[in-house]
Amino acid sequence: MVIKNVEFIKSATRPAHYPAGDFPEIAFAGRSNVGKSSLINVLVNRKSLVRTSSTPGRTQLINFFDVNGEFTLVDLPGYGFARVPLAVKKEWGPMMETYLSKRSNLRGVILILDIRRTPVAEDVQMLHWLRAYSVKPIIVVTKCDKVSKNERAKQAAVIAQTIGIQMAELNFFSALSKEGKDQIWQRIEGVLYGAETEAVGAES
């Protein structure tokens, strides 16, 4: 994917405020501090398209970006940060389920996991929603430069078992080395333009 132009469109919290039009959308989801901002910035060749917050999880907004005038990149709010107020945590579930169930031009969701962490309940819930609403997931495991090859293999097995997928469905990524960037774009293009014949992580 050659990135020619990326522009912020708007932020929203409810369907009435989502951008108009029928451009296909690819959304990015993951717990706070999972490396979502770094992944997006590397994929679109920008240093600060998505800024890393000093107070993770406090901003509960869905952010929409136009990419090449061809599709929309959607940055979903992070989840799972312990110090977020309870009221904010309660908003996350309904906001996510509404977007996933009602956004007809949503083609797929990049579910981002940290190679050093066991997936949390919200990760499992997100994957459940994607399956329930027939949204194709692409599982990306970040921060792979922070562990050894042996530790990566062990952690990958734990992650796959926890969320109920095959290890081969994991896409490994490092913001430092850019490992996985091309593979992830191939997966995204497949979902956007129909090359993918079946949902990643679909239950057999």
Swiss-Prot record:
Keywords noted in UniProt: Cell cycle, Cell division, GTP-binding, Magnesium, Metal-binding, Nucleotide-binding, Septation
Cofactor: Mg(2+)
Annotated GO MF terms: GTP binding; metal ion binding
Pfam families named in the record: MMR_HSR1 (PF01926)
Positions bound to GTP: 30-37, 57-61, 75-78, 142-145, 173-175
Keyword 4Fe-4S: no
UniProt GO BP: division septum assembly
Entries under InterPro entries matching the protein: G_ENGB_dom (IPR030393), GTP-bd (IPR006073), GTP-bd_ribosome_bio_YsxC (IPR019987), P-loop_NTPase (IPR027417), Small_GTP-bd (IPR005225)
Residues annotated as binding Mg(2+): 37, 59
Domain EngB-type G stretches: 22-194
PROSITE patterns linked: G_ENGB
Highest taxon listed in the record's lineage: Bacteria
Nucleotide-binding among keywords: yes
GO cellular component: cytosol
HAMAP family assigned to the protein according to its UniProt record, in alphabetical order: GTPase_EngB (MF_00321)
Family designation: Belongs to the TRAFAC class TrmE-Era-EngA-EngB-Septin-like GTPase superfamily. EngB GTPase family.
Purpose: Necessary for normal cell division and for the maintenance of normal septation.
Protein name: Probable GTP-binding protein EngB
Species per Swiss-Prot/TrEMBL record: Geotalea uraniireducens (strain Rf4) (Geobacter uraniireducens)
